[in-house]
Amino acid sequence: MNVCFVGCGNIAQAMIDGLLSNGISTSSIACIERNQRKVELLKEKNLKVIELDNLAKENFDLVILAVKPKDALSAEKNIFQAAPNSKILTVVAGIELNKYSNPNSVIRSMPNTSSAF
């Protein structure tokens, strides 16, 4: 299974750590992140960091939307423009499915950072 995280904050990091500790290879996980400090940390974990424009080329089974709520709707639109057949799992708090541009292709989940423990 190939997974791409769009946004790699605390919840995404907890999910990535969980995937890695359960045997998912780093080669199966990619990240799209704007914060250069986080990009360096992701690369230290041997995770692939890609640009949104390359999303369609990578052929991911699942794209996990883990950005701040203020960025979620535009990020989701950009994901569908870059890779219209993407399945999206959103972990963004406070945004109902009907607010997304393609709500039938979005799955909503609400983990929290204590899930890491």
Put a short name on every predicted segment.
Residues 1-52:
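NAD(P)+-binding Rossmann beta1-loop-alpha1 motif at the extreme N-terminus of oxidoreductases
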Residues 45, 52-117:
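Rossmann-like NAD(P)(H) cofactor-binding subdomain of soluble oxidoreductases
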